[in-house]
């Protein structure tokens, strides 16, 4: 919960599934698992993993982080109004962020980063970005500026909807 909203992270759902399967949460393992889940359960499979969290939320507004495909958006539309915010940054900026973040599954080499990028492009992230209701360029923002900007947009949407 943050600023009065439930925050659900799709990547955390994949990490939880990896844990259930006793897989080490490395980038290659999580990438392979994500593709396997989509192949077996459809392109919206990762969104399906967060449905229980959506259903259990007592809040009217849920922020879902990490959408990668239009099929995931369609799954989420079964549970309410969906507004899409694309946060974009240059390749070098994103690589720097991921390297600094320091999660076990974050790419530490340019090669691993490019593999991750190509995997996400392959599942349709570019199409989801193209459908976004709003975009933020995150090349020169601090983390706090990004959060502030993001929640201003969300609050604007809330005023539109209500």
Report residues per predicted region:
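Conserved nucleotide-binding/hydrolysis micro-motifs of P-loop NTPases
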Residues: 13, 89-94, 141-142
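Short, charged, surface-exposed secondary-structure boundary motifs
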Residues: 17-21, 93-99, 145-148
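Small-molecule kinase domains that catalyze NTP-dependent phosphoryl transfer to phosphate-bearing small molecules
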Residues: 44, 100-156, 160-161
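A glycine- and Lys/Arg-enriched "phosphate-lid" helix/loop adjacent to the NTP-binding pocket
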Residues: 27-32, 75-127
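Well-ordered beta-strand positions
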Residues: 6, 83, 133-134
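A conserved segment at the C-terminal end of the G1
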Residues: 1-5
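ATP-dependent small-molecule kinase phosphotransfer cores
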Residues: 6-63, 67-74, 110-112
